[in-house]
């Protein structure tokens, strides 16, 4: 949620920054016009309530003076004022709901360092990384070797990814991990969680269903309600689209102790997504599923520390890819490509040799106080004694299924086997996946 005082006091600047976020010109004008109506109604209601108090005093005085005529007139005036207050309250309730709904649909404002542009073509690469020794690895080839297979093809050949039965049981974009596939997925997320614990994150096991209030606090609702899986009576609960929702809401409606900041937390969870806008995209494989595992990182920080913590969180995500020795690059997203609640986002994209391009595997964002305002998450500043909103940061560390897919593509061998990355071998128990040990 944006600070309405900032929007009022910096109208032109705020309007341009919203246009940069692909908000239509005029949306802010409508919001501020309704906000002024709301404030005007509040002033009128306060004046009438003050008048009601005066009339109440007049009634008391007239009764004490046994002036029945004056008392009856004052009572009549009271009834008139009460009716006016009731009418104003009804108008105020309607305009407040309108203002709140409009404000809830406005995205966060981008940090000035974010590249301005309407789409992903304006994203800017920050850095690129690949292992120093790529001997025998597909990524070392200037051209994709003819034997190289897409991750879903080699997964099916080895019998470790079963898409056909996933579709039979649950429909499109579902699968079964089988044998070594399930063990590889488990090895990957256990490795990720252990790395983040070493980096200072406290591990949580969160609920997988949350209330609509929780979805509102992190910015998924009301704008993206069609992308969610709503369940329960009257659709009062939602399957989490990311552990970010459960992690941020862990401290919703709380005043944190300043000594807790920065607070690092992490969790593994399934993510449930409708993928409403993904028709025809990535219809095969692990890239775009309705249910997938993801390790999430979240931070609560002081405002002055949040961008330094954003850089650290990005490095924490990069650390996973570097230890897995998977080629990747980091891009800073443009104003038109960032997520709804983000003020700045870095995407990590891992190399997929069969696609001859990088694919997103992590998105790391600073939401500044956008979520904290919606979720009322504050701390008391020890210097001023005043309450301040924390800044919240979130990042994938990483999307587990996409990591498995990247391993299958980058670590496959000409004989159809998969070499297990060295850091995963203590978790997986073997150094290769072949047809002989796939189950």
Swiss-Prot record:
Pathway linked to the protein: Aminoacyl-tRNA biosynthesis; selenocysteinyl-tRNA(Sec) biosynthesis; L-seryl-tRNA(Sec) from L-serine and tRNA(Sec): step 1/1
Positions of ATP binding: 273-275, 360-363
InterPro entries in the cross-refs: aa-tRNA-synt_IIb (IPR002314), aa-tRNA-synth_II (IPR006195), aa-tRNA-synth_II/BPL/LPL (IPR045864), Ser-tRNA-ligase_type_1 (IPR002317), Ser-tRNA-synth_1_N (IPR015866), SerRS_1_N_sf (IPR042103), SerRS_core (IPR033729), tRNA-bd_arm (IPR010978)
Single GO cellular component term: cytoplasm
UniProt keyword terms in alphabetical order: Aminoacyl-tRNA synthetase, ATP-binding, Cytoplasm, Ligase, Nucleotide-binding, Protein biosynthesis
Any one Gene Ontology molecular-function term assigned to this protein's record: transferase activity
Location(s) in or outside the cell: Cytoplasm
Reported function: Catalyzes the attachment of serine to tRNA(Ser). Is also able to aminoacylate tRNA(Sec) with serine, to form the misacylated tRNA L-seryl-tRNA(Sec), which will be further converted into selenocysteinyl-tRNA(Sec).
Family per record: Belongs to the class-II aminoacyl-tRNA synthetase family. Type-1 seryl-tRNA synthetase subfamily.
Domain notes for this protein: Consists of two distinct domains, a catalytic core and a N-terminal extension that is involved in tRNA binding.
Subunit structure: Homodimer. The tRNA molecule binds across the dimer.
Protein name, per record: Serine--tRNA ligase
């Amino acid at each position: 949620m944006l600070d309405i005082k900032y929007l009022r006091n910096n109208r032109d600047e705020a309007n341009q920054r919203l246009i940069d976020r692909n908000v239509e010109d005029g949306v802010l004008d409508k919001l501020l016009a309704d906000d002024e109506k709301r404030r005007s109604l509040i002033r009128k209601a306060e004046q009438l309530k003050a008048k009601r108090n005066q009339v109440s005093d007049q009634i008391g005085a007239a009764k004490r003076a046994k002036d029945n005529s004056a008392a009856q007139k004052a009572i009549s005036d009271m009834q008139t004022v009460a009716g006016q207050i009731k009418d104003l309250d009804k108008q105020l309730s309607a305009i407040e709901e309108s203002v709140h709904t409009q404000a809830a649909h406005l995205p966060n404002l981008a940090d000035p360092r974010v590249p301005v542009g309407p789409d992903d073509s304006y994203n800017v690469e920050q850095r690129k990384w690949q292992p120093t020794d790529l001997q025998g690895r597909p990524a070392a080839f200037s051209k994709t070797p003819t034997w190289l297979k897409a991750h879903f093809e080699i997964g099916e050949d080895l019998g470790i990814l079963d898409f056909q039965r996933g579709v039979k049981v649950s429909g499109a974009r579902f699968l079964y991990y089988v044998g070594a596939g399930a063990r590889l997925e488990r090895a990957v997320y256990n490795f990720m969680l252990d790395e983040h614990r070493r980096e200072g994150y406290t591990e949580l096991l969160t609920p997988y269903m949350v209330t609509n209030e929780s979805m509102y606090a992190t910015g998924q609702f009301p704008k993206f309600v069609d992308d969610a899986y709503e369940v329960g009576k009257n659709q009062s609960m939602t399957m989490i689209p990311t552990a970010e929702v459960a992690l941020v809401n862990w401290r919703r409606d709380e005043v944190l102790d300043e000594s807790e900041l920065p607070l690092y937390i992490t969790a593994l969870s399934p993510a449930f997504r409708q993928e409403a806008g993904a028709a025809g995209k990535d219809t095969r494989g692990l890239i775009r599923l309705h249910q997938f595992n993801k390790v999430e990182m979240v931070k609560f920080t002081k405002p002055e520390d949040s961008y330094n913590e954003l850089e650290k969180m990005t490095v924490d995500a990069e650390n996973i890819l570097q230890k897995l020795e998977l080629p990747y690059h980091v891009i800073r997203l443009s104003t038109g490509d960032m997520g709804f609640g983000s003020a700045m986002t870095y995407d990590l994209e891992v190399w997929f040799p069969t696609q001859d391009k990088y694919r997103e595997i992590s998105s790391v964002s600073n939401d500044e106080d956008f979520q904290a305002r919606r979720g009322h998450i504050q701390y008391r500043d020890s210097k001023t004694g005043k309450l301040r909103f924390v800044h919240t940061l979130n990042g994938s560390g990483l999307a587990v299924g996409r990591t498995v897919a990247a391993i299958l593509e980058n670590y496959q061998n000409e004989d159809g086997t998969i070499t297990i990355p060295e850091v995963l071998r203590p978790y997986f128990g073997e150094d290769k996946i072949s047809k002989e040990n796939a189950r």
